[in-house]
Amino acid sequence: MAEETSNDNLVVQGNEIVPSNGEALAEEVQGDELVLAEDLIQGDEVQGNELVSAEMSIPPTSRRRRKKSLVWEHFTIEAVSGGATRACCKLCKQTFAYSSGSKIAGTSHLKRHITLGSCPKIKNQEHKLLLTPAGGTDNDGEGTVERPSKRRYRYTGYANAAFDQERSCSYLAKMIILHDYPLHIVQQPAFTTFIDSLQPRFRVVDVETMEWEVYAVYQKEKENLMQAFNTMPGRISLAIGLWTTSQTLGYVSLAGQFIDSEWKMHRRMLNFMMVSSPHSENALSEAISTSLSDWNMKDKLFTITLDNDCSSHDIYSANLRDYLSNKNNLMLKGQLFVVRCYAHILNAVAQDVIASIHGVIYNIRESIKFIKASPSCEEKFAEIALQLEIPSTKTLCLDVTTQWNTTYLMLLAALDYKQAFSTLETSDDNYNEAPSAEDWKKVEAACNYLKLLYDSAHSIMAAANPTSNLFFHEAWKLQLELSNATGREDPVFSSIAKDMHERFDKYWKDCNLVLAIAVVMDPRFKMKLVEFSYSKIYGVEAAKYVKVVDDAVHELYNEYVAQPLPLTPAYVEQGGGNNAPASENSTQATAPSTGDGLVDFDMYLSEIATSQPTKSELEQYLDESLTPRIQEFDILNWWKLNTLKYPTLSKMARDILAIPMSMVSSGNSIFSAGTGTRMLDDYRSSSRPEIVEALVCAKDWLQYLPATPEAPSTALVKVDAA
């Protein structure tokens, strides 16, 4: 809301100045500055943000006009020797050059003196000049400080806006939250000195008060998010992460993913709770139930996505499903309820590849360290590569051991220079780490398979907010490639492929149903891609697996028909409230007409409608031709445009497309997900659990808000005073 600051007959609204009686003032904006029209006279002009007087010749016989520039309320003109004059500040008595002979200097330097804090009297008495009546006593006890009787300078921006301690504390709390600053920054001397230089009136609070401010921000943003959830038209899916601290405390993060009434995807952190044992399904179930109750969404849970990859995943998931099914109405008997993180499985498979050749990778790391140890050695290696006419333009670099993509890129670059490594070993007695020919074959095989994982991860990263339908494409191609690779005759390639396929095949069996249902909701593919891909993977048994998917899609759709979600205002606006009984609709459609002699025809139509029921939305959707595949296709926008055509099926699509198939989908985090339980930093883990939750959740929420309010004008304007 625009901030208002009143002064006598003028009021500042936002960045504008208007009279309190609503009448317009004659004013003019020049550059970034608002200047009253009466002050723009003769030689005064606005240049940039400054009001200056243009140089002019004064004929000695001309009548001198009264000076109306604002600065002359603060300066007097005094004659000095040689016919020159100087401008003298009325407050500090400092003088400035003004005229010499027939030339008059500009007034910009005079204006800077009174507006930028150069005048010591104005600097010391700024507050008193704004608030005390004329005739007040200055802080030095030197008597009355002269105050302009009619007008004074003031900025319209925040620099001179009314100071608000509470608002400033709230902004400080948001800064701490967004930038992960420690709460005790408010006690650091350098910080307090900096704040004092900006606003001496700001009272720096203690750590306990700042904790309260952080929690207040958290509560306010939580209320706003709660209102959004109250109008959410569909269900919500949870992405669950496990955390620990250096004190071995356990935390669970719960992020909700959903599609709003405008068919926009959102993911918001809901809770960050401390639990006794995060790896226990009972503790995790309690955390989920608490979160759903806290957000009033007990009947809206659709799926949960876990990033664990333990051997007891089936038992873990079954126990979790059984516990929550007693308190929540799980769709499709809970078959889709527990989803495993795709990014995690990619990382787990990649780690299997790296582990299979860890000895070779160690030698390559040591070789690169040797080459990079000195400029002379690096230059020698470059000369060898040039002599061998190696065409590669890749640069040797060390990897980050926690990010498998960097290991892949390191191996890929080293593979191009394998001859150079061997030549360096024969020409330098200090180097003996060159991999053998068999080692390089292992590296080649590893790079071949790591490329599959690398490309799959980048395909997911290409989408800003990947919907669940995108993951089927990556998963089925990877399943097919690894399945075929296990039959390769080369033992080096086949042995690595077998380890990879064993792990990924477990993921495929657990998740291929939810992946397939998601791609059916893509109008570019529907059941056709499922049929095609399953024929490649399962061969003659494909029809059996296709039927499983088809039956599940129809069963899930029937659940949406029989048990629609509670209507929300957003859904009603989209035309989803037409749930009149079929018999009533058919009666209205076939009501006998009168007076046209076609009563028998109407009865015939009624009989046809009874004997030949119309297709369901799902059957109509599946029977229609596929939507053309284009690069810029937006699946959420397609369903938004077809909501009225498929009112029930669109509800099903909204929930399915919002399933978080991956805990992470962007940045380097996708290459390091699932490397173990994540560690909470010492700063946060030392805080109380409720403050930790406030810091983590509020940071997630605030990043979706505008960073700063619109910056106001900093123009100097004239304000009348009594």
Swiss-Prot record:
Recorded coiled-coil stretches: none
Annotated function: Transposase-like protein that is essential for plant growth and development. May regulate global gene expression by recruiting other cellular factors.
Key word Thylakoid present: no
Subcellular location field: Nucleus
GO MF term set: DNA binding; protein dimerization activity; zinc ion binding
SMART domains reported in the protein's UniProt record: ZnF_BED
Segments forming BED-type zinc fingers: 66-126
Complex formation: Homodimer.
GO BP: post-embryonic development
Region (Disordered), start-end ranges: 572-592
Location of the region described as HATC (Hobo-Ac-Tam3) domain in the Swiss-Prot/TrEMBL record: 617-702
Disruption phenotype: Reduced plant size and amount of seeds.
PANTHER family: ZINC FINGER BED DOMAIN-CONTAINING PROTEIN 39, ZINC FINGER BED DOMAIN-CONTAINING PROTEIN 4
Listed GO CC annotations: nucleus
Predominant place of localization: nucleus
PROSITE patterns: ZF_BED
Protein name: Zinc finger BED domain-containing protein RICESLEEPER 1
Superkingdom of this protein's organism: Eukaryota
InterPro entries xrefs: hAT-like_transposase_RNase-H (IPR025525), HATC_C_dom (IPR008906), RNaseH-like_sf (IPR012337), Znf_BED (IPR003656), ZnF_BED_domain_contain (IPR052035), Znf_C2H2_sf (IPR036236)
UniProt keyword terms in alphabetical order: DNA-binding, Metal-binding, Nucleus, Transcription, Transcription regulation, Zinc, Zinc-finger
